[in-house]
A protein has these predicted regions:
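A glycine- and charged-residue-rich anion-binding loop/surface
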Residues: 1-148
Length: 148
């Protein structure tokens, strides 16, 4: 069963906007050797040059660190350092990291639009990190004056 991705939900009239969810409640639908699948999540799964969210899943009497989040055929796997003792969990995203990635992502789109308009170069790749971002353009025939 696919995982409901909370930050992709309809935004009209929602407060806060689902993109800004920092915490959520969910039920486990699957357990693997080092991961769980939830019925719903606000954790971003790695993809499109953007790193995975990290954070914690909490339940009465315990918590596990979310080390990585991966998406496979609509199912989102949360790789953990410990398995939950409950099927009901409360997820908490590392918001500082997520928000930095959101800002880099938006900046990448702005830069890509400007580079396309001014230089006719398309974005062919990008990678976001916690403290920086990289964007690849093609054709990348910039002169030293262009980059000054």
């Amino acid at each position: 069963m696919p995982t409901t991705v909370l930050y992709m939900e309809e935004r009209k009239g929602q407060d806060p906007d689902p993109c800004y969810l920092r915490e959520f409640d969910a039920r486990l639908t699957e357990r693997g050797p080092d991961y769980v699948v939830l019925d719903r999540t606000a954790f971003y799964a790695e993809g499109g040059g953007q790193p995975t969210d990290i954070g914690v899943l909490r339940w009465p009497g315990g918590e596990a660190r979310v080390l990585r989040v991966a998406k496979e055929k609509g199912v989102i796997k949360h790789v953990l350092d410990a398995m939950p003792a409950s099927n009901e969990v409360h997820g908490v995203i590392d918001w500082d990291r997520r928000y930095a990635h959101m800002r880099y992502h938006t900046s990448q789109h702005l830069m890509s639009g400007l580079v396309w308009k001014i230089f006719g170069a398309r974005t062919v790749g990008n990678q976001l990190y916690a403290d920086r971002a990289r964007v690849d353009f093609q054709p990348a025939a910039f002169t030293p004056e262009d980059l000054a």
